[in-house]
């Protein structure tokens, strides 16, 4: 995989950006429409809330949890092949899911296969933007994240229309054809010229001086490299980021799954209930470019991006409490408008902060470890919320749960980044003091002969104070 571009921010980079935007609209935006099918799937398979919730949880877990495998494919085959492979898998899973006779079959096809394909396409689209853009990277990430907003806007409306005309099986068949367009987006990622000498064919994990190595040791080294455990162990910022965002992810996806059923449960028309998520996406289409221009145009904000990210998560968590006040459509509409603002901040900063923390040559591996942890939380959170809903029959507790995870996750990030920055400043200050002390040799440690020789040296050569 190329790491240093010959023409960063070039003309073809904008074509790649468009490809990334469309790919994120197709992949990340799709899970937000699952709530439209929630009631029909529950009725057709005669399942409870917790059982039906396993479908979006498995889909979300695979979208995130396939990260390590995706990073291996990106390293060995590049983003182009990986994205096109993801498009084929995502389409195949949705088409085969139309023949599902039970929830188990649906979990395997539309959940596992489609989710893994979406993971390959979505993560490749993020990685390739970081490689094609350097100077305008914050703006590029913000524009690419518009894909999620467009997906959130269009997928629920399309899902509602197809559900009413073709049923959920026909809708899933159409979705399979739509997801195949990820292959077209991948074809646009043509190879990039670099200034770097091609890497040797030997595996860097197997030094040429070592003739033999056990299979187990090789597997362990490969896993450690592609899961970025070395970064997690030595990079405090990455450790804080992974901990906070993984914890936050336990509550972040819940409104996307349960908002539409919540509105329908309280008498809101099916069409207008599906429109709520589309309103969130529509607002983000305009908010994200403006936020991206703000971040890209002011370099002074670069040092505070991680704190802005924590604040956005905090606001997002507090916003979910609005749903507990009332289920009236006007209240939910206001909730969606406020939620859009905080979701915009989270969306444009989540990967930009990660790019600020880790070097780009290790970004695919760091993204793989981060996403597999988020995949675990995505697998746990919706069924847990569904079980809570079955026990209480009250949607308010689901939004309380979401708010609690988001607020606590923002505190982990904000306090953690602040403490790590203070610790680093303290260590840097101590290191400078030690260097200055070691460069100045005290006169009382010199012999009389050394003192005489020191006095005979020219004045300019007797001073070695430096900041380097």
From Swiss-Prot:
Residues 446-455 have a biased composition (Basic and acidic residues). Residues 35-53, 102, 160-171, 261-274, 328-330, 390-396 are extracellular. InterPro entries: MFS (IPR011701), MFS_dom (IPR020846), MFS_trans_sf (IPR036259), Proton-linked_MCT (IPR050327). Residues 429-468 are annotated as: Disordered. Keywords: Cell membrane, Membrane, Symport, Transmembrane, Transmembrane helix, Transport. SUPFAM superfamilies: MFS general substrate transporter. It is found in: Cell membrane. GO terms for cellular component: plasma membrane. GO terms for molecular function: symporter activity. It holds the Pfam family MFS_1. Residues 1-13, 75-80, 123-138, 193-239, 296-306, 352-368, 418-468 are cytoplasmic. It comes from the Eukaryota. It is a multi-pass membrane protein. The chain crosses the membrane at residues 14-34, 54-74, 81-101, 103-122, 139-159, 172-192, 240-260, 275-295, 307-327, 331-351, 369-389, 397-417. Gene3D superfamilies: MFS general substrate transporter like domains (1.20.1250.20). Proton-linked monocarboxylate transporter. Catalyzes the rapid transport across the plasma membrane of many monocarboxylates such as lactate, pyruvate, branched-chain oxo acids derived from leucine, valine and isoleucine, and the ketone bodies acetoacetate, beta-hydroxybutyrate and acetate. Belongs to the major facilitator superfamily. Monocarboxylate porter (TC 2.A.1.13) family. This is Monocarboxylate transporter 6. The gene is Slc16a5.
């Amino acid at each position: 995989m190329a790491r240093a571009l010959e023409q960063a921010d070039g003309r073809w980079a904008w074509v790649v950006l468009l490809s990334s935007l469309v790919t994120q609209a197709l992949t990340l935006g799709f899970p937000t429409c699952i709530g439209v099918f929630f009631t029909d799937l529950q009725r057709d398979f005669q399942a409870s809330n917790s059982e039906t919730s396993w479908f979006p949880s498995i889909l979300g877990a695979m979208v995130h949890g396939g990260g390590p495998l995706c990073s291996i494919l990106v390293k060995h085959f590049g983003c182009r092949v990986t994205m096109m492979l993801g498009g084929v898998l995502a389409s195949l899973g949705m088409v085969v899911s139309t023949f599902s006779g039970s929830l188990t079959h649906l979990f395997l096809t539309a959940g596992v296969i489609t989710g893994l394909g979406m993971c390959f396409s979505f993560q490749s689209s993020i990685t390739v933007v970081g490689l094609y853009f350097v100077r305008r990277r914050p703006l590029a990430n913000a524009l690419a994240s518009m894909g999620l907003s467009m997906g959130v806007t269009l997928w629920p409306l399309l899902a509602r229309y197809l559900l009413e005309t073709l049923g959920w099986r026909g809708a899933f068949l159409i979705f399979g054809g739509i997801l195949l367009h990820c292959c077209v987006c991948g074809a646009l990622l043509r190879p990039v010229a670099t200034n770097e000498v091609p890497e040797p064919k030997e595996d860097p994990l197997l030094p040429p001086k070592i003739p033999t190595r056990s299979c187990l040791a090789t597997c362990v080294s490969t896993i450690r490299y592609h899961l970025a455990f070395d970064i997690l162990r030595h990079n405090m910022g990455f450790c804080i980021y992974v901990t906070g965002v993984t914890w936050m992810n336990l509550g972040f996806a819940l409104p996307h799954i349960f908002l539409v059923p919540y509105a329908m449960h309280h008498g809101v028309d099916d069409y207008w209930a599906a429109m709520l998520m589309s309103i969130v996406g529509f607002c983000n289409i305009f908010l994200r470019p403006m936020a991206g221009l703000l971040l890209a145009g002011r370099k002074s904000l670069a040092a505070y991006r991680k704190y802005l990210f924590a604040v956005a998560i905090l606001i997002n968590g507090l916003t979910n409490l609005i749903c507990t006040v009332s289920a009236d459509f006007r209240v939910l509409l206001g909730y969606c408008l406020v939620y859009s603002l905080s979701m915009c901040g989270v969306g444009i900063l989540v990967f930009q902060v990660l790019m600020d923390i880790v070097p780009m040559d290790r970004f695919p591996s760091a993204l793989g470890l981060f996403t597999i942890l988020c995949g675990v939380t995505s697998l746990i959170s919706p069924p847990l919320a569904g079980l809570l809903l079955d026990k209480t029959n009250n949607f308010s507790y689901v939004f309380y749960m979401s708010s609690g995870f988001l607020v606590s996750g923002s505190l982990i990030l904000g306090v953690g980044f602040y403490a790590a920055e203070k610790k680093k400043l303290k260590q840097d200050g101590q290191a400078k003091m030690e260097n200055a002390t070691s460069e100045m040799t005290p006169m009382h440690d010199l012999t009389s002969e050394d003192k005489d020789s020191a006095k005979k040296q020219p004045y300019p050569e007797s001073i070695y104070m430096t900041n380097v």
